[in-house]
Amino acid sequence: MSYVDAHFDRDSDIIRVVERKDGKRDFREYQAKYTFYHEDQRGKYKSVYGDPLTRIVCKSTKDFRKEVAINRDKKLFESDINPIFQCLSENYLNQDAPKLNIAFFDIETDFDPERGFADPSDPFMPITSISVYLQWMETMICLAVPPKTLTMDQAKKTLEGIENVMLFEKEGQMIDTFLTLIEDADILSGWNSEGYDIP
């Protein structure tokens, strides 16, 4: 079992981890642990400098903050460690990295001869096509709404013999299909996606 990503829900003190196991995505939840150490002459733990330390483990943000406040006059160690890293080191140390599912995509929009291309803040023109390469399937798929100059039948006839092209009557249907195709992607990468496709 190897992890892909993790999210820390501070409100519920739960760490949600996404794993890949046998090529499938799996979701796990762990109770957050807030661990830190403080100087204590009777402590059972040692710092890297040999100082005796006591270990404090809390299961909620509230308790953690309270314990840090109680011990604020002592020298603290590891009180700034994110609970996600603690969880990952306890549960996934020395695990192999997963084979990530990567999807590459590009979105094309219609063009208005008078106004030009639509800006993401004012998307006045519809999406006309989305191409997506699913690396884990080694498959390129093109989703498109036929141009206004062709009927659906004419567009289908034009595409005869070309694999992995899907035509749609409406932009919304095409977007729904795209979202379904990328559902199992761990990483999404796109051409000009940050500045335009996904503003």
Feature annotation, model-predicted:
Residues M1-P199:
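The two-metal-ion catalytic cores of nucleic-acid processing enzymes
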